[in-house]
A protein has these predicted regions:
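Conserved class I S-adenosyl-L-methionine
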Residues: 1-60, 77, 179-182
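C-terminal alpha-helical "lid/dimerization" subdomain adjacent to the S-adenosyl-L-methionine
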Residues: 13, 29, 36-38, 162-220
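Short glycine-centered segments of the SAM/dcSAM-binding site in methyltransferase folds
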Residues: 63, 158-160
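Class I SAM-dependent methyltransferase SAM/SAH-binding core
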Residues: 63-121
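A short acidic, Gly/Pro-enriched loop at the edge of an enzyme's catalytic core
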Residues: 120-131
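A short SAM/SAH-binding and catalytic strip from SAM-dependent methyltransferases
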Residues: 131-143
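A short glycine-rich, Lys/Arg-flanked "PGG" loop and its adjoining helix->strand segment in the class I
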Residues: 145-157
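Core SAM-dependent methyltransferase catalytic element
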Residues: 204-243
Length: 243
């Protein structure tokens, strides 16, 4: 099953500093991967991540869900600056989440809780969170339609959905690595959004959509309308089929 393949792939990286170095583009090997696969340097890598997380206000004190949390390398230092926030971190991989929990413990974070779970069936009530953050997750989710629905469901009206993930069709070399390496290793799962399909989807589901991309990484910040019934009635665009 695809979910088990994904869990196995991330089991191999959960305790691996190479993964953290690659995600942050901060080690020699990580910088090499960023350049080879993503055609980015560290400044570019930092730029799209900063855009993705700019949807979290300074001194945020509401309820935030991060899915997937991964190893926590990108967000635990940020959460250290948000002592009044109520933060929940969810991941399908217990091995990745263990690394995130260890980082939280080292930073003495008391307002962050962890839970293993599936983004396609979130174990939370409707309208629970003020912010849902998803960094580098949707390109891995096997049931993306369910993930989009669940994120929308648990986000309160007026809440913010922000994050980033891979979009196809922006850089040929990146697309090749995704198709021939990352998919085969179990890290990525088709189908994928394009810049245009993602914009159409977010515009159809949310209001105040701010979105852009840096090469093959799209970032977005959008708000759930308070009149959510009207938004839900709109027909959502389907994924473009990969040729």
């Amino acid at each position: 099953e695809r979910k088990e393949a994904i869990r196995g792939a991330y089991r191999m990286t959960g305790g691996n500093s190479f993964y953290d170095g690659m995600i942050t583009c901060s080690t020699l090997s990580g910088k090499a991967v960023c350049r080879l696969v993503w055609a980015m340097n560290k400044a570019e890598n930092d730029a799209y991540l900063e855009k993705a997380m700019s949807g979290i206000p300074e001194h945020f004190s509401g309820k935030l869900l991060e899915v997937p949390v991964g190893t926590g390398i990108l967000t635990m230092p940020v959460y250290q600056t948000m002592p009044e926030a109520d933060i929940t971190c969810l991941d399908y991989s217990p091995d990745m989440m263990r690394q995130a929990r260890e980082k939280a413990d080292r930073l003495h974070l008391k307002n962050v809780t962890f839970r293993q779970g599936d983004v396609g069936a979130l174990p939370y009530e409707d309208d629970t969170f003020d912010i849902v953050l998803s960094l580098n997750g949707f390109h891995a989710f096997p049931d993306k339609e369910a993930a989009y629905r669940e994120v929308f469901r648990v986000l309160r009206p007026g809440g913010t959905f922000c994050g980033c993930f891979y979009v196809m069709g922006e850089h040929k070399r990146t697309d090749w690595f995704v198709r021939h390496v990352y998919e085969k290793a179990g890290f990525f799962t088709p189908p994928y959004e394009t810049v245009s399909s993602l914009k159409a989807r977010l515009d159809g589901m949310y209001t105040d959509v701010d979105m852009g991309n840096l090469k093959s990484m799209a970032w977005f910040i959008c708000r759930k309308a308070k009149e959510e019934a009207m938004i839900c009635q709109r027909k959502q665009p389907s994924f473009r089929k990969k040729k």
